Amino acid sequence: MSPQTETKASVGFKAGVKDYRLTYYTPEYETKDTDILAAFRVSPQPGVPPEEAGAAVAAESSTGTWTTVWTDGLTSLDRYKGRCYHIEPVPGEDSQWICYVAYPLDLFEEGSVTNMFTSIVGNVFGFKALRALRLEDLRIPPTYSKTFQGPPHGIQVERDKLNKYGRPLLGCTIKPKLGLSAKNYGRACYECLRGGLDFTKDDENVNSQPFMRWRDRFVFCAEAIYKSQAETGEIKGHYLNATAGTCEEMMKRAVFARELGVPIVMHDYLTGGFTANTTLAHYCRDNGLLLHIHRAMHAVIDRQKNHGMHFRVLAKALRMSGGDHIHAGTVVGKLEGEREITLGFVDLLRDDFIEKDRARGIFFTQDWVSMPGVIPVASGGIHVWHMPALTEIFGDDSVLQFGGGTLGHPWGNAPGAAANRVALEACVQARNEGRDLAREGNEIIRAACKWSPELAAACEVWKAIKFEFAPVDTID
């Protein structure tokens, strides 16, 4: 940082460039149960000591600015300031540190993810004294989490609404994602639902384009839901994407979905924004709608290891803002997702209490104090050969979503859905019999092919499809 340059006014006021360490680096501080705790990966500029960098992060994300100001004397900075209370080097890195910052609860508006992020991941990420900055994790105290509604319904309520127990749920994103007419789109939904899937889904960028306006899509998809329910005797759903250019338009679409009597709507929570998402989540709880969340834009924020924000933080924020499902990677598919890291934030989405576990990237113990859980959705480049691994990795409380892995079946959409349903039922039965899905998965799928020609055809098509790239974001 710049050297201390001070001038003394006649009343004793000192102005100049601050040395942040003097005020915001407090290694003796004992954190409170009510503090929001943050773990930042800090990469200082050459010549900036880690204590100064960590203190600068604490200052610029709470009460501080670059100089001393007159109005500092009009409040209690000790009560409101963030504190960098611990620093540790990142293993294998010469110029990176994990800096732990504690924020007093009074800095944040109740029930507002928007306000929380505006402070913690605001202007500080452009601070010149840092080459890079990444928020790795947050500890949300029960005192603060209790000010949020959280998911509209949660895992158990969703199962009760759908009357589906003891297995993962199956979904399919309709493809091509853009260009279909509303009627053809609804036809594809019907075929997939009739074939055995629980859900079909709007792609994240399907909103209301010239080739398919939202109201037409909603009507044809509702027809597909009711027709497939009548034929199969199962409750079905389609994630109707309510994301829009304004909150008012988003709510108009959600209201129309409720009037159609469908069970679930959808929102792109990062591009749509946390304020819009929380508004929609409150409406969904009040009106009995499930809420599916897509994380479009997340990789812009979370994929680089040195800068941005880890997805586990975005996952916690979503649980607070509200959503019943969220896309969470696949481990085995085409999208980024290292196994232990993915399992770490899957637990943060579903469980009531999660212990600190650095081996899975969890920096803090998190107690959600009975806030409803969120179902993780595995989607992206998966097919029937992945079913044993997905069932073993994600367990029953998950949605396994096959887009191309359903619609790419050589015999059509309904046979593609049937192949996925047979593969899932075979894996669940084998698991319940005590078989090892990780070791015997391929054998289980081959055995099921003998009595399901649809599955046999799918296995032949996708037998050589793999996405074998090393993940970018890994445990240190």
Swiss-Prot record:
CC terms in the record's Gene Ontology section: chloroplast
This protein's record includes keyword GTP-binding: no
Enzyme Commission identifier(s): 4.1.1.39
Modified residue annotations for N-acetylproline: 3
Chain positions with N6-carboxylysine modification: 201
Entry function: RuBisCO catalyzes two reactions: the carboxylation of D-ribulose 1,5-bisphosphate, the primary event in carbon dioxide fixation, as well as the oxidative fragmentation of the pentose substrate in the photorespiration process. Both reactions occur simultaneously and in competition at the same active site.
NCBIfam families for the chain: PRK04208.1 (NF003252)
Record-stated family: Belongs to the RuBisCO large chain family. Type I subfamily.
Localisation per UniProt entry: Plastid, Chloroplast
Cleaved propeptide residues: 1-2
InterPro entries: RuBisCO (IPR033966), RuBisCo_large_chain_AS (IPR020878), RuBisCO_lsu_C (IPR000685), RuBisCO_lsu_C_sf (IPR036376), RuBisCO_lsu_fd_N (IPR017443), RuBisCO_lsu_N_sf (IPR036422), RuBisCO_lsuI (IPR020888)
Protein name, as recorded: Ribulose bisphosphate carboxylase large chain
Binding site for Mg(2+): 201, 203-204
Superkingdom of the source species: Eukaryota
Organism: Brachypodium distachyon (Purple false brome)
Catalytic class of the enzyme: lyase
Binding note for cofactor: Binds 1 Mg(2+) ion per subunit.
Catalytic center residues: 175, 294
Cofactor(s) this protein requires: Mg(2+)
Catalytic activity: 2 (2R)-3-phosphoglycerate + 2 H(+) = D-ribulose 1,5-bisphosphate + CO2 + H2O; D-ribulose 1,5-bisphosphate + O2 = 2-phosphoglycolate + (2R)-3-phosphoglycerate + 2 H(+)
Residues that bear N6,N6,N6-trimethyllysine: 14
